[in-house]
Amino acid sequence: MSKKRLYEIAKELGKESKEVVARAKELGLDVKSHSSSVEEAVAAKIAASFKPAAAPKVEAKPAAPKVSAEKKAEKSEPAKPAVAKEEAKPAEPVAPKTEKVAAKPQSRNFKAEREARAKEQAERRKQNKGNNRDQQQNGNRQKNDGRNGGKQGQSNRDNRRFNDQAKKQQGQQKRRNERRQQEDKRSNQVAPRIDFKARAAALKAEQNAEYARSSEERFKQYQAAKEALAQANKRKEPEEIFEEAAKLAEQAQQVQAVVEVVPEKKEPAVDTRRKKQARPDKNRDDYDHEEDGPRKQQKNRSSQNQVRNQKNSNWNNNKKNKKGNNKNNRNQTPKPVTERKFHELPTEFEYTDGMTVAEIAKRIKREPAEIVKKLFMMGVMATQNQSLDGETIELLMVDYGIEAKQKVEVDNADIERFFVEDGYLNEDELVERPPVVTIMGHVDHGKTTLLDTLRNSRVATGEAGGITQHIGAYQIVENGKKITFLDTPGHAAFTSMRARGASVTDITILVVAADDGVMPQTIEAINHSKAANVPIIVAINKIDKPGANPERVIGELAEHGVMSTAWGGDSEFVEISAKFNQNIEELLETVLLVAEIQELKADPTVRAIGTVIEARLDKGKGAVATLLVQQGTLNVQDPIVVGNTFGRVRAMTNDLGRRVKVAGPSTPVSITGLNEAPMAGDHFAVYEDEKSARAAGEERAKRALMKQRQATQRVSLENLFDTLKAGELKSVNVIIKADVQGSVEALSASLQKIDVEGVKVTIVHSAVGAINESDVTLAEASNAFIVGFNVRPTPQARQQAEADDVEIRLHSIIYKVIEEMEEAMKGMLDPEFEEKVIGEAVIRETFKVSKVGTIGGFMVINGKVARDSKVRVIRDGVVIYDGELASLKHYKDDVKEVTNGREGGLMIDGYNDIKMDDVIEAYVMEEIKR
C-alpha cells in the first residue's frame, strides 16, 4: 500500500503541518515531524478526525482505529518476527497513553533495568557466538570440499560461497533491524517524544500575554498621571510643578506596589518545560563484527539526546533568570526623557592648521557628523579624524557664522625670537649700558699687552708662544663708566673666534704694529667688523720702536677701506705704546666718545639674554660657560637654556674671579649648572621655570641631532667622482681635546685645512676637558692618535695608552700642532720611486745548459751590473723583456756586481731567449723624498 506524508495531508485539508502532527499524536500514532509517512488508511483516519461529524466516533472507541491500523501494518510486513510477538500482546488503549504524556513521569528502578539489560545482552552474545562457531565450521567444511573437488567444481563452489555470504548478510541485517525496532518501541514507551516547538510557542504566548497586561496597566497609570500633571501645571511656578510631579511619581509607585501585592487570579499554567528523560543505552552486540574486522559503530542517539536536553535545560534556566530581571525592571518607574541641551555657537573661533573634525566639533559644541555633512555639501570629503587646512576651517566657520582667527603658535624652543622681537624690551625701562669693545689684530701686534695695560696686570706674559689661545672678557672702569673688553686671538687658526667676537661687540679696536703694518689677520679683522657693522678705532701700536712708521699704516688701511677722520673717513686713529702706557687714556676717551654717539641702551627688567663667549669642562665644577649678558639681568638660580643645553645657574663669577649674584647688561660672567658644555657663540635665554627650560633644551638637542643626520652627504652625479676619489684617499684619524671650546673649533678647522695630496684628516672626536680613559679606548678602536691642547691626560689614561700603544701628543701652541700634523700626513703617503740606470752590457756568447737554461756571456760597456738590480733585454732598440737576474758570475765565482770593462755570465729569471748582440740594461728604483 502506498503511504502519505503528514505535510501532504495538511496541504489537502488546508491545515498547518504542526496541527496535523499534533492530531496524529493525539490519535496515538508514532510520528516525529511533518515529514513522517503513514498508510493511506491511517491518513484517512487523520483526515476524518478534522471533520465535526467524526469527532464522537473517536471518543466512543478510541482504541479501535489504532488496533486496526496496527494490524494492517503488521500484515504488510509478515517477515518481521518482532512484530508478530507484538500481535500476541493485548492491545493497549490510546487514551491512557496520552494521559502519560501530560502526567508527571513516575520514578523508575534504574538498577533493576540495567541488570535486566545486562542479562539480555549476555544471553544474546552467547547465542551469537554459537551461531558464529557453526558458520565457521560450515565455512571450513566448504573449503575442504572445494579443495577436494578439483577444477570442475570450482564454479559451483564459488556460487555456493556467494549464496552463503548473501544469506548470512541478510540474516545479520534482519536481526539488526529487529533490534532497532525493539529499541525504538522501548524508547517510545518509556519516554514519548515531546513537541518542543508547540511547548515553546505556548510558553511564549503566555509570557507575551502577561507582559501585555502589565504594560497596559502601567501605560494607563502613566497617561492618567501625565494628564493630571498637565492640568494642574497650567498656571503654576516651575518649583511647584516639579514638587507635584515628584508626588505623583510616588503615588504611581504606591499603586504599582499594590498591584503587585494583589495580583489577579490566573489558572495554573501547564508545565511545558522539557524534562530531562533518562533513555536506556543502546545494546552493544557482536552483530557489528564481521570476518574482515569491526564495522564503524552507530552513533549513540541516547547520549546525544542527553546532551541536548542538558543544553536546553540550561538555556531555559538562563532565560528564566533573564525574564525575572526584566520583570523587576518593568516594575520600576520609567525615567523621564531628558531633552537635549542646545549650545549656542561661539562668536569667535581660534584655530590652528591641522585641526581634526572631532576637535572642531568639540570646540564649537556640535556633533562631528553634522560637520562632516556640512563639509560634504561644500565638496570636501572628510572623516572626524581627518585634519583640515586653514582655508577649509575658515570656510566652515563662515558657514556657521563664526569669525575665524588663526592662532599664532610660539615655538618655545626658539631662543632667537628673544633677540628679534620688538615687544620683548620695554621702551620705558631702557637705560644706558656699558659698551662692549673687542680688541682685534694680527698675531704679536700687542693686543694682549694693550689689554694687560688696561687691567694693570701681567696676563700677557702667561700666553704660550706669545699668542692668545681663547677669548678673554674683562671689565674696567674709566671716568666712572664701565667698559667691557674682549680679547680675540690673532692667529689664522682662530678665524671663527674673531668672527664671534665681532658679532657681539659694539666697538672694535684694531691694533696694528707701526713697524709691521697691515698683515693678513688685520685684513680679516677689518672684514669681520664691516660685516657686523661695527665702528673701528685703529690703535697704531709700538710707536716707540725705531722702525715705526704710522703714516705708512694709515695709508695701507685706507687701501682696505678704513679711512681716518683726518682724511675724511669715519674711523678714529690713536697712536699708542701699550708697553710704555703711552696715549692709553686718549684711547679710552675715544672709546667712550664713540659709545656715547651710538647711544647704547638695554632693559635690565626683562629676563636675561646673551651670547656664549667661551665654554669648557672643569674637573670639579663640570660645564663652565663664559656668558656676555646683552639684555636683561641674570640672577643665580635662574632656569636657563644655552644653545642645545639647559640647566639652572648654580653659581656666577665675574672677570676677577669673585662670586656675584646679579649680572646686568654688558657684563661678562662665568656660570655653572649646565648639563653639558655648550658651543662658543651660542645664544642663551632665561625661561620662566625649569620645566619649560628643560623642554626647550631637549627639543633643541633633538632638532640639532636630526639636522646632523640630514646633513649626511648623498651620492649624486655631481659628486660621484669626488666620492670615488675620496675613497682612494688615506685618512689620518685624530681625537682633539682642548681646554676651551674655541680652541677645539680652531684646531679642528686648521687640521682639516691641511692640504696634502692623497691624505685627509678625519676628526674622530673633539671635546673640552682632560684626556681620559674613554678617549684612549676610542683612539685604539678607531686607530687614531690624541692631540691635547693645553690639557693633560689623567694617570689612568696615560697607563692605558702605554698598554694599548696609543700615541698622545700634547701641545700649547697651535701652529706647532699644524706643522706636526702635516709631517704625519706626508708620512702616510706611499713612497714614490724613480728609476735610475746603473749600467749597460752586451751579450758576446750564449750557452745552453740542459735543466738550467740559457747563460749569456757579457761585457760591461758602461757603469756596472749588480746582482740585486733589475735588467731589460733590448734588441734592435726594442725592449724585449724586463725582469730580474737569477744569477751573476765572474767566470765560475758568484759576485754581487760586475764593473765596467769586465766580463761575466748571467741568467735572467724566467727568460731563456737570449741572443748575441742583445743589450742588457741594468737599473734600480730609488725613493724620492717629498
From Swiss-Prot:
InterPro entries the UniProt entry points to: EF-G-like_DII, IF2_II, IF2_N, P-loop_NTPase, Small_GTP-bd, T_Tr_GTP-bd_dom, TF_IF2_bacterial-like, TIF_IF2
Region entry G4, spans: 541-544
Family the entry assigns: Belongs to the TRAFAC class translation factor GTPase superfamily. Classic translation factor GTPase family. IF-2 subfamily.
Region (G5): 577-579
Region (Disordered): 50-217, 260-346
PANTHER family: TR-TYPE G DOMAIN-CONTAINING PROTEIN, TRANSLATION INITIATION FACTOR IF-2-RELATED
Basic and acidic residues bias locations: 68-90, 110-125, 157-167, 262-295, 337-346
G3: annotated segments: 487-490
Name this polypeptide is given: Translation initiation factor IF-2
Localization: Cytoplasm
Taxon lineage: Bacteria, Bacillati, Bacillota, Bacilli, Lactobacillales
Ranges of biased composition (kind: Low complexity): 50-67, 129-141, 309-318
GN (gene name): infB
Purpose: One of the essential components for the initiation of protein synthesis. Protects formylmethionyl-tRNA from spontaneous hydrolysis and promotes its binding to the 30S ribosomal subunits. Also involved in the hydrolysis of GTP during the formation of the 70S ribosomal complex.
